[in-house]
């Protein structure tokens, strides 16, 4: 357990740092900037988007990644909430003049071409964002607290936990899971309080699709799935690489970004193929 905590802490530090193998080798190489991914989301047209240290990238199958728009923020948090509708957080790009160091909650309604501020500018740096049931859940790295808003403007501060990732139940707005260095935590009161979940693997990243199993990944790249909201877990596939982000899109589709590339599964993480391969 002690060694697992050390590995968890090391990977967590990499995931939170602002500067900072699959079955098939057919993935394409990436342009500069894509190799540090903080969040992914699948748009309604089936195209994968990734929020990175150097902006948002569009990753269409059989095409090279494309930087979207002219805004090159450091996206520490990124999620797709609807067709061409994204939310993000992090730090402003080098070309952003007179902008506070923390972006708070920002939003794009044109597929990432432009972004505008919604709230918490200069105050919050959300390293995990989840949109469920008309609510935005954010994990603020500065205060180590989960925050919730119903109107994207007025935020309510909930439990303070040393978490790396959070995931909200697609069926219960009160059900929230969080990964920590001491194990998986569960909330049944919309992140006001958390309790440990017994006998779970040392998960660091989570993704909870509208349909299909909850997906979790360990710091060493072992993919797990849960059919009962995180109570029990089944090992699926060992990628053997350090994970950066995961997106479980439902209908068996799972994307995992690691330090070596992006992997794609069509069977809920049982097998994977290379989607994109990062330059060495």
Task: Please report, for each region that a protein language model flagged, where it lies by residue.
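Extracellular glycan-interacting surfaces
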Residues: 2-5, 15-280
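Hydrophobic helical h-region of N-terminal Sec-dependent signal peptides
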Residues: 9-11
């Amino acid at each position: 357990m002690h060694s697992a905590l050390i590995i968890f802490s090391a990977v967590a530090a990499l995931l939170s740092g602002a500067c900072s193998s699959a079955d098939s080798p057919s993935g394409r190489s990436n342009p500069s900037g894509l190799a540090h991914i903080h969040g992914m989301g699948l748009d309604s047209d089936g195209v994968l988007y990734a929020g990175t240290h150097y902006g948002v990238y569009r990753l269409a199958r059989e095409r090279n990644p494309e930087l979207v728009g002219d805004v090159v923020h450091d996206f520490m948090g990124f999620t797709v909430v609807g067709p061409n509708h994204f939310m993000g957080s992090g730090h402003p790009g080098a070309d952003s003049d007179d902008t506070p160091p923390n972006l708070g909650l920002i939003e794009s309604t044109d597929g990432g071409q432009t972004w505008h501020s919604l709230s918490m500018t200069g105050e919050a740096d959300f390293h995990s964002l989840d949109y469920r049931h008309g609510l935005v859940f954010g994990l603020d790295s500065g205060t180590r607290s989960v925050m919730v808003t119903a109107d994207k403007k007025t935020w309510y501060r909930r439990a303070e936990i040393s978490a790396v990732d959070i995931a909200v139940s697609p069926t219960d707005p009160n059900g929230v899971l969080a990964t920590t260095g001491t194990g998986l935590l569960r909330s049944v009161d919309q992140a006001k309080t958390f309790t440990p979940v017994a006998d779970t693997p040392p998960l660091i990243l989570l993704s909870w699709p509208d349909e299909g199993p909850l997906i979790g990944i360990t710091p060493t790249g072992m993919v797990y799935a849960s059919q009962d909201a995180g109570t029990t877990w089944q090992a699926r596939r060992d990628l053997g690489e350090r994970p950066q982000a995961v997106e479980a899109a439902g209908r068996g589709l799972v994307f995992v970004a690691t330090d070596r590339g992006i992997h794609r599964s069509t069977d809920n993480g049982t097998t994977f193929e290379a989607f994109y391969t990062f330059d060495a």
